Every structure is written in structure tokens, then in C-alpha cells.
């Protein structure tokens, strides 16, 4: 059991279950009911070394779970505490909640923002990214949060072999034919090709500057500026791009790019 040097009360299974099902008032009542000889710590653990934060992160179903996790962390809950299998709260949030939902994404964001280690290895070497086992609409947000915070796209198993996240998507996803898997593959391929998350986010900036340079040297001709154009998001983006690449060395391009911070 994970515990501090002092003797603290073991976390009863039913209290862990209370955190799992969202009965947070019962959990708080249990925490308040300790004694000097057997204090009930926010980091008390029970079966399989699960703490209250493990139970809460693993079963996040509503915004109330996020608020309770925030409360636990504010009271000193260790975000990197490990279960007997070496899983941290990030591992459990990625792999135990079923399909990714906006609530799961919010839980991951909270854990990362409060210091969770994105490359923490479990007993066999798996990092949180490799606990993802199914893909839904919000999964790409998870695959954005973790690499953005520095998560590696590879992990080394305790037996010495290495697996890439691309291989993980091929072999360990329950629904590999999901329409969302393709978007994740494209994102991962772009990050890997760029060499880092920040470099991946800088690619659009470089592409605009390269196109602008070609226009300035007469290597590319843009269509004549239009007074009117059809409505639509794609058309507005095209017009914005045309505006950027038509600018000379007047500082406008650099000012715009300095404000355009693409998810990093």
C-alpha cells in the first residue's frame, strides 16, 4: 500500500467506490472521520494501492468529477501516485473511462496542469498515451494534450522492445476502423515528421512564409483580388491567406503570425 511514514487509515473499498460513482459527500465525511492514531489521509490507498484520486480520475462521467479531483489535488492528493501495477491517474484517465468524452479531456487537462508526469512508466513500461484502447470523437483532444505536454510517441517495454503509437493504433485499439482514427494518424504523423509538438504547430507559419517568398519572387501567381466572394468558412480562410501572401515587408505578416499561436 502506498502511504506516508505515519500510520494512516487504509482506504476502504466502499469509499473508493463512492468516489467512483460520484458520492463525494460520503468521501468527504469519511476523510473527516479519522482519529489522531489513525488519520485518514487524502492519499490513503486501499485495494491495489488505489487512492481517491485514482478512483475519481478513472471513472470521470460529469463535471462534478473534475471539481472533486480539483478539490483532492488542492488538499494534497499526489497526481503521480502509483497503483500496484504502476498506473498513475493519467494512465487510468486514458484507459479506464471507456470512450473519450469532453469530461475525460477536462480531467486529463486538469491532471497535466497540476503536474502529472506525461511520460511516467507503469510496471511494464507503458506511458499514459499507450493506455488509450478505443477511439471516439474526443480522443484526438487527448492525443493533443499529451504530446503538447511532452509525451513521447514511443515507449520501451520492460522486456526491451519498443513500440510506436502508430503500431499501438494498429494493434491495440478496439475500433481501428473508426472514422476518427484517420485524423489521429495524420496528427501523429505530422508531429513525428516535424520532430516535436512545437515544430508541428509552426508548420503553417512556415508554409505561409514560404508561399509569400515565392509570390515576392514571381515564382507563384495569385488570382486577381475579388471584390465579392461566396460566403463560407473555407472561402474566408482562402481570402485571409491571399491577404497575407500579398503583403510586402511592411511588418503586417509578422504581426499576424505573432498572434497566431496554434495549440501549443
Where on the chain are the PLM-derived regions?
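Conserved ankyrin/ankyrin-like repeat signature
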Residues: 26, 64-68, 103-107, 141-142, ...
